[in-house]
Every structure is written in C-alpha cells, then in structure tokens.
From Swiss-Prot:
Self-association state and partner proteins as the record states: Homotetramer.
Biological classification of the source: Bacteria, Bacillati, Actinomycetota, Actinomycetes, Mycobacteriales
Protein's recorded name: Glucose-1-phosphate adenylyltransferase
NCBIfam families named among the record's database cross-references: glgC, PRK00725.1, PRK00844.1
Gene3D superfamilies on file: Hexapeptide repeat proteins, Spore Coat Polysaccharide Biosynthesis Protein SpsA, Chain A
Gene designation: glgC
C-alpha cells in the first residue's frame, strides 16, 4: 500500500454502491450487487476498495441504497480503518437531505451527499463504481487528470468495436480531449490510432471539485435529466470541451503480469460473472489473485480452518477457500467459497459455489452457480439435463444454471 504523502492533492473518494443488479438475479435477490461474493473469499466491492486503499486514498465514502445490510456489515467488519488519523471507509445510506425521496440516479446520489464534499473540502473527487473486477492504481489517473487541466477525466478501456455497443463510448482527439460521449451506440466510434477499437467507459471518474458541484446543481434543475453520471454529468462536461479520457492500458500496477495487465471485467450478467471466475483458475490465470504487491483485501469471517481433503477427495484446477471439506468427492475447474462441503462420490465441475453450500453424496453439479447455503441432496443432478434445470432454476443464455440462496434441491 502506498503511504499517504504530505503535499499530495487532497482527494475524496466516492464509491457508487447502490445498484440493484437486476441482470445478476437471483444473486442480487437479497443483497446489493457490490455485496455479491466473488472468488472464494471476496465480495465485488473489495476490488475497488483495494485499489483505492493500495493507492493511499483513505477517505472513502461508499454510497449505498438497495438491500444494503450485508454490504454495510461487510464494510464495517472488513474495512474498518477509522481512528485518530481522520481516515475512514464509511458506508453512507441515502440521507433524504433534499426531501423525502431516495436516490433517483447516480448523480442524484452524490448531490444528496454533497455534505461529504463540503466537510472534507477536497481538491479532487474520485467517483468509482463498485461492481467491477480489476486492478488499478487510481493515483496515476489523478495525476494525469491534474496535468490535463480539464474538469473531469473518464477512465476508458479499449474494447473491440463490435463489443462496444454495451458500453458508454468515448470519442477523443489525439490529445485525449473527449469530443463525444455516446451511451450504448449502435455504431461505436473508433479510437484515433485504431478504427477497429473503441474506448469504453469504465464508470470511473476524477473530478475537479468545484466543477463537479456546479454540474450536479445544474443537473438537479434540469427536468429532462435522469440524473445519471454517465448519461448526464459526463455529457455536460463533454459539451463544454472540458473532459479528458484516461487510457486504462497505461496504468501500471505493481506485480502485474503480462497476462493480467489491463484486465477489467463488468460482471453485470450471470454469464460474465461465471466467466470471470473461470479466468481465475488456470495455471497462469488471466486475472491473478495472488499478486502480493497489489493485494485484494478482505476479511474471512469465522476464523475458519484450512480447507481439508479426506478419503481421497480431490480438487483439480480449482480454488478452494478456508473451512471447506472435500470428502471422497471430486472438484474440477471450480471456485469454492468458504465452508463448502462436497460429500462422498459427488462431482463438481465448472461450478462456482458460494459460502455454506452442501453437495450431497453422489450428486453432480456442472456449469452452475450455487448461492449461499444451497443444499444439494444426495444423488441430485444440476447442469446435466437442460430442460429439467430450466423448469426449476434460472439458466442463462450461456447455459449457466443459477440456484438462489438457501434453497434445498
């Protein structure tokens, strides 16, 4: 972690964590999207918070709203950095400071939380999303933002042009000035150096504070606005020639490998969430969780013992979290969270198992995501018969079977 250095610009980080995550249902049925477990021991929000903390930013407000109990608890338990130093990572629910209403959009969430900015009086405000899987040193983006002289910088990642229709797309000139910002266009623009590649917005922004406050207040008076950061606030600055694109490919993270440099995934769908897990488990993973120079921080609750393999139980090309027991069962190409039990004769292949899952004797689970505390009875088959699975569970376009929290099947 980078130490806070005297003379660095005063920065407040705001993490937007109020999203409902409808496309991840049923994983988001009882929790906010940033609270969804990921990678065996983490939650999605751990990635953005780790990036900020590793870069030395320790004044972080996490704006929450939708079913935030588990998210609030995770932040208070795993991210408690408060003390006499003035540092904090705080969960901030909707305050209704501007009337009896909840957040109506991401920009409105910050507008209703302007007291955080007035209290801290930062020079710059980082506004990052809470539900992406990646490593990034935000301080490099802040430094480039300051040099640009613009009021906002938008982090952009290069994606194939044909895939960019799912993102906010950035068109810029040779100097990095954003000339156009298009929300999910049918015909995405190319970059100045490659017409087959598009800058897609990562949903990460750095603002000069005064300009952000002015834009939020102007937006609040616009009856036609949806009060969205990407849809309304960023175009506000682009129209004024006051926006800069930060090329994520230039971000250098200590300890990154050539394979995972520039890795960023939007895990907003079941298929994307599943595939991102599969990126973790190869010998040379596409995304390496074992980078000690830029760790992903979290706290594993329960003081769990190490994973145990007994009676010939095996796990191949898999990640198995503490507290799990593989007893005469077989696990392949899977990610098992904490406190998972796989019993005699059971087979788990290409699966993501959340905390507390139980796989009964002789059961088979393939190409599936099982949410927290799911119990699979002895001899049950999941991911084997598509028609039967479709009648009982959600099956994604990519064929991933998802079983909701606490079900006994």
């Amino acid at each position: 972690m980078v130490e806070c250095v005297k003379g660095r610009p005063n920065v407040l980080a705001i993490v937007l964590a109020g999203g409902e995550g409808k496309r991840l249902f049923p994983l988001t049925e009882d929790r906010a999207k940033p609270a969804v477990p990921f990678g065996g021991t983490y939650r999605l929000i751990d990635f953005v918070l780790s990036n900020l903390v590793n870069a030395g930013y320790l004044k972080i407000a996490v704006l929450t709203q939708y079913k935030s109990h588990s998210l609030d608890r995770h932040i208070s338990v795993s991210w408690n950095v408060s003390g006499p130093t003035g540092q904090y990572i705080a969960s901030v629910p909707a305050q209704q400071r501007l009337g009896k209403r909840w957040f109506t959009g991401s920009a409105d969430a910050i507008l209703q939380s302007l007291n955080l900015i007035s209290d801290e009086k930062p020079d710059y405000v980082i506004v990052f999303g809470a539900d992406h899987v990646y490593r990034m040193d935000p301080s490099q983006m802040v430094d480039e933002h300051i040099k640009s002289g613009k009021s906002v910088s938008v982090a952009g990642i290069r994606v194939p042009r044909h895939e960019a229709t799912a993102f906010g797309c950035i068109q810029s000139d040779d100097e990095g000035n954003i000339t156009e910002f298009l929300e999910k266009p049918a015909d995405p623009p190319g970059t100045p150096d490659d017409p087959d590649v598009t800058f897609a917005s990562m949903g990460n922004y750095v603002f000069t504070t005064e300009a952000l406050v002015r834009a939020l207040k102007d937006d609040s008076e616009n009856e036609d606005s949806e009060h969205d950061m990407g849809g309304d606030i960023i175009p506000y600055f682009v129209d004024r020639g006051d926006a800069h694109v930060y090329d994520f490919s230039r971000n250098i993270v200590p300890g990154a490998t050539e394979r995972d440099k520039g890795y960023w995934r939007d895990v907003g769908t079941i298929d994307a969430f599943y595939e991102c897990h599969m990126d973790l488990i190869s010998v040379h993973p596409i995304f390496n969780l074992y980078n000690k120079e830029w760790p992903i921080h979290t706290t594993v609750e329960g003081n769990l013992p190490p994973a145990k393999f007994v009676q010939g139980g095996i796990a191949q090309s898999s990640m198995v979290a503490p507290g799990s027991i593989i007893s005469a069962g077989t696990v392949r190409n899977s990610v098992l969270s904490t406190d998972v039990i796989v019993e005699e004769g059971a087979t788990v292949e290409g699966a993501v198992l959340m905390p507390g899952v139980r796989i009964g004797k002789g059961a088979v689970v393939r190409h599936a995501i099982l949410d927290k505390n799911v119990v699979v009875r002895d001899g049950e088959l999941i991911g084997v018969d598509h028609d039967r699975d479709s009648q009982r569970f959600k099956v994604s376009a990519g064929g991933v079977v998802t079983v909701g929290k606490n079900q006994v099947v």
